[in-house]
Amino acid sequence: AALKDLTDTARIALLPGSGWPQQTGVAELEQMAPLTGSFVELGDEGCVVWSRTGKKLNSIQSGYARPALAAGKTRFVLYNRSGNELRVESRTQNLYTKQLENSIFLCAISDNGTLAVVTEDQTSMAKLLVYSPSMEQQLSWSMTSNDGTPLRMAFSPDSRKLAAAAVTVSGGQVMTNLYLINLASGDPVSLVNQGGVPQWLGWTSASTIL
């Protein structure tokens, strides 16, 4: 899959396109994310990948009731927020399709293709799963009501750490717990606990979270 990503990058850079503006085929745009040499658009009926020169690279009709996507550099994950299926896509083709045991809340994907998934959990508040770029499970964390449910996630630029902002209720107040997970060790570290709901979470450098 890594070789395929490199091949795609070289091929996309050389592909002629029709240029812009043009119709992309997405009637009602819900999300858009940049990829290397291209971008992906999500509409209510599926998503489309276009090169920066205006060449259509991929088109996916998922049939998901509540589709959402998260993107890295060369891959993106398309998932169903009303179901338990996700698809990991390169810019030109499907790499993996996975059915999880429980409904999906949220996904994030790193620049190297590491995937984080938050699902419902029968015995706790939520479960955080992390998969390698080859879809081998690296981490599983059953999160209690005190831990909260992740509402925002972001991988570090080097893809070695995952920040997660999890929302919980304490004393009638909505609180956010910010965790940092080193993927090599798998141990979550609580960084801060504060009131309110996070609107955005990201890395401004290799070591700074905003």
Where are these regions (language model features)?
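Beta-propeller blade-edge and WD-like acidic-aromatic loop motif
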Residues: G46-S51, N84-N94, M125-L139, G172-S190
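Asp-box/WD-like beta-propeller blade repeats and closely related beta-sheet repeat scaffolds
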Residues: L95-L115, T119, A126-K127, S134-R152
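Structured, soluble extracytoplasmic/luminal domains of envelope-associated proteins
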Residues: V49-F105, S110
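Repeated scaffold domains used in trafficking and secretory/extracellular systems
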Residues: G25-M32, S62-T74, N102-D111, D147-A154, ...
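Gram-positive cell-envelope targeting signals
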Residues: A1-G19, E30, F76
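Short beta-strand elements that form the blades of beta-propeller/WD-repeat-like
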Residues: E30-G43, C47-V48, A68-R81, L86-R87, ...
